[in-house]
C-alpha cells in the first residue's frame, strides 16, 4: 500500500489527516490508524487543524467535541486577539487529543495548525509540507446544504496538489 501513495519515494511518503471537531473527522482519523498503519509507521502521520480567522465566534475544546460562544462582531483589536487566541487553544487541544489517539495505536504523529479558511488552509498545508496523500472525513451534507455552504472535501478534491481520500462513515444499520 505504501508504494501506491503519492509521488514520494521509499519511506518518505507523507500522509496528512485534516480534522475538526466533528465525528466524521474522528472517524477518518480512526480509519487511517486501522487501515494505513503500515504506511504511517514509516514516517509520522501529519494531523492538521485549520484555525478559522477571528470573526463573530469563539471556539473552545470540550473533550473531543466543541463548544462555541458567539459575540457581537467588533473592530476592537482586543476582541480579535482574544478570539484568535481561543481558536488557537481549541486547535492545540484538538491536536493533542488526536496525537494521544495516535500514540495509543503506536503511531507517531506530527501536529500542524494554520489560520485561514479551512478549504484553502488544508490545500496550502498540503503544498507547504509536501504531502503525498490527504485524508478527510466526509460530513455528509445534503446537496443543497453543500451547494450553499460549500464543502471542504469537495474543494480539496479539486484543488489539493496530491491524491485525496475522503472517508465516508458507513450508515448505521437499524435491526
Predicted segment positions?
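Structural beta-alpha unit
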Residues: 1-11, 34, 74, 80-85, ...
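Small/aliphatic-rich secondary-structure junction motif
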Residues: 2-78, 100-105, 110, 159
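Glycine-rich, Arg-bearing micro-motifs that act as flexible, cationic patches
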Residues: 14, 133-158, 173-175
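Eukaryotic short linear interaction motifs
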Residues: 25-26, 54-57, 62, 120-121, ...
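Gly/Pro- and small hydrophobic-enriched strand-loop and loop-to-helix capping segments
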Residues: 40-44, 167-173
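Short, ordered loop/turn segments at secondary-structure junctions
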Residues: 50, 139, 169-170
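Short, hinge-like loop/turn segments at secondary-structure boundaries
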Residues: 63-65, 128-130, 153
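Short, acidic/small-residue loops that bind anionic groups at enzyme active sites
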Residues: 159-168
